[in-house]
Amino acid sequence: MEGPSSSSVPTASDAPSKYLLPSDSDDGIATSSAANVGARNHVTNTEKMEKEKKPSPMVLNVDPDYDYDEEDGGSCEEDQRGPPAPISREIVDGAIARRSRDRQISPGVKMSIGNYDDMEDDDEEAETPEEQKQRFLASMKRIRNQPQEAFDPPEDTEAMREFINRQVNDAMMFNRDNHIDYSPVNKPKEAKIIEGYLWGGIIGTGSYGKVKEVIDIYTITRRAAKIMKYEKLRKIPNGWDNIRSEMSILRRLNHRNIVKLIEVFNLPEKGKVYMIFEYCIGSVQNLIDMEPAHRLSIGESHAIFLELCHGLNYLHSKRVSHKDIKPGNLLLSIDMTVKICDFGVAEQICLFQSDGRCTKVNGTPKFQPPECVYGNHEYFDGYKVDMWSAGVTLYNMVSGKYPFEQQVLLRLYESIGTNPVEMPTNVELSKDLQDIIKRLLDKDFNTRPNISDVMQHPWFQTGFPEDQGLGRIMERMRTGDRPFTMYPSLQAMYDGAGSEVILDEDGNELVLPPPDLVKRGLKFFLELKILENLPGTLSLSSFPGFQTLEKRPGDGPPPSSDSGVVAAPDSASGDPLRRPSSRSMPTSAPPRPPSGAVEVVEAVAAPEAVVEDPVVEEAPAQQQEAPDRRRRGKRSLFSCIFRSRTDSS
């Protein structure tokens, strides 16, 4: 029961009629003068104390249902500070009425001391259960939507584990039974399958990401997957735009000298984009790096340049400018077919343009033309940019050098724009080869030849054995080991799977091809021991026993010889050695050999350095017909089946 106490003390004359004192009996109220005098003195003292202290109004809550019982430990004795404040009948009745109303609104007993007005405000502001529920839901939603910082978990390295084990063992020296011996658990490799592709090892890296070898588990076809992360694409200027442009261009191209785009898919939960291409074993740059002389033979360079021009002719017919032709972007398929790749900076020329005018400069500095790096033109021809890059690529393949080389980038640009082209001195180049290089490296793009002019050049139309897939190219195809990184994944899928069901990352069961064929193939290759240590890309170990172009002291232009034999003094023994090459030894355009050429070769060459050919006696007749294709007779069925890649007849 709640109610405000009186703020002022009544007079002595009103006290007998309005107040009930605890000492009053039920029969009546004492009216003696002594009592009145005592009450009057008490009231006077109380008024003085209240005037001095001036306390705030007090609220005395009294419960009418409370049954006082002295046995419970209660006491009604007067307070030590003075008699209790008197209570009137009106105050008690009002408190009882308010208590009844409070019970109807909110049942329960509540006792408090404070201002009555404040209590009413608290009752008015009290939240209903529905409001409390809404406030709780709002707070939970705010906590759930609060951004949280992502911290990378600490790397559990071998050194960290050893340190922890050492500390634990030192702390438990008193009990040898608790000693911990750490031995790493060799978990079996699990087959990684994403979007129907079994993933192998890395076969290449680049500025946009890395390339891995994969196998289509439904067709057992080797593919190459280019993996690009969202974060790296955002950091590269125009990274996303270049990727979208590459996808749109490759989807419209279909040529044997252009790498084929198989599929593109995106995994937002991993933050990666995947581009699936046809598989290639390496690049022209790998072939150059494998040679100790860092160059290729003239015949190999001609065969590669031949297919490069066919690919550029197709691109330019589709109004596409690659703008980044270089040996690293010329891939080699398993049959040594050249395929142009990396269309990240390629540009689609507008259909309504009469020329290949471009304004956006991209590419590798050493392969860029003067109009792009020297800054003396407002625009440039995208088709002529590809021809300049093709000329630098040809120069690099035949000599192992670049036409313009400087250590500082600005000096390189200045050299490209001002210095004349100098022919390499470490190799002997024919006049036709020098002429086509000079024309391709013409600093004026208006007079620089286009792809049609290059394909009509005499050196381009010259025949080489390498053009027919012979020579060193055929030797690589016949004796080389193909890069293969899928053996651990295949072994984990078929040999380690057992009777368990293989699931992809989404938990779906994979329908695999019959494993018996794959198991027999794996068993065969495992017995031969040729799949375990193969690298991901072409290297010197890919072609065991292959004779490369060795770099000699003072590697200068070799003397010409009708038989194709290069006699060079050896640094150790001084004996003449035949230039290392293939069985047919194509080092230049094969001239018409005179009679008795074979006997001269056998007499001059050292027996231990010569690669014997069992059919060398038939070589003059074959070489005699090789340069002139128009004199061939009617071809048989087998000739049509095994015809060369460059022969369209």
Curated annotation (Swiss-Prot):
Residues binding ATP, per UniProt: 203-211, 226
Low complexity bias spans: 597-609
GO cellular component, one term: centrosome
Domain Protein kinase span(s) in chain numbering: 197-460
This protein's UniProt keywords: ATP-binding, Cytoplasm, Developmental protein, Kinase, Magnesium, Manganese, Metal-binding, Nucleotide-binding, Serine/threonine-protein kinase, Stress response, Transferase
Obligatory cofactor(s): Mg(2+); Mn(2+)
Compositionally biased intervals (Basic and acidic residues): 45-55
GO process terms (BP): establishment of cell polarity; glucose homeostasis; mitotic spindle organization; regulation of cell growth
Catalytic activity entry: L-seryl-[protein] + ATP = O-phospho-L-seryl-[protein] + ADP + H(+); L-threonyl-[protein] + ATP = O-phospho-L-threonyl-[protein] + ADP + H(+)
EC number from the UniProt entry: 2.7.11.1
Active site: 324 (proton acceptor)
Biased composition (Polar residues): 1-11
Primary localisation category: cytoplasm
Acidic residues biased stretches: 64-77, 117-129
UniProt GO MF annotations: ATP binding; metal ion binding; protein kinase activator activity; protein serine kinase activity; protein serine/threonine kinase activity
Region ranges (Disordered): 1-132, 548-649
Localization (cell): Cytoplasm, Cell cortex
Domain of life (superkingdom): Eukaryota
PANTHER family from the UniProt entry: MAP/MICROTUBULE AFFINITY-REGULATING KINASE, NON-SPECIFIC SERINE_THREONINE PROTEIN KINASE
Similarity comment text for this entry: Belongs to the protein kinase superfamily. CAMK Ser/Thr protein kinase family. LKB1 subfamily.
Function: Required for cytoplasmic partitioning and asymmetric cell division in early embryogenesis. Phosphorylates and restricts the asymmetry effectors mex-5 and mex-6 to the anterior cytoplasm of the zygote and maintains these phosphorylations until fertilization. Phosphorylates and regulates aak-2 in response to oxidative stress. May also play a role in motility, behavioral response, regulation of lifespan and dauer formation through this pathway.
Record's protein name: Serine/threonine-protein kinase par-4
Organism: Caenorhabditis briggsae
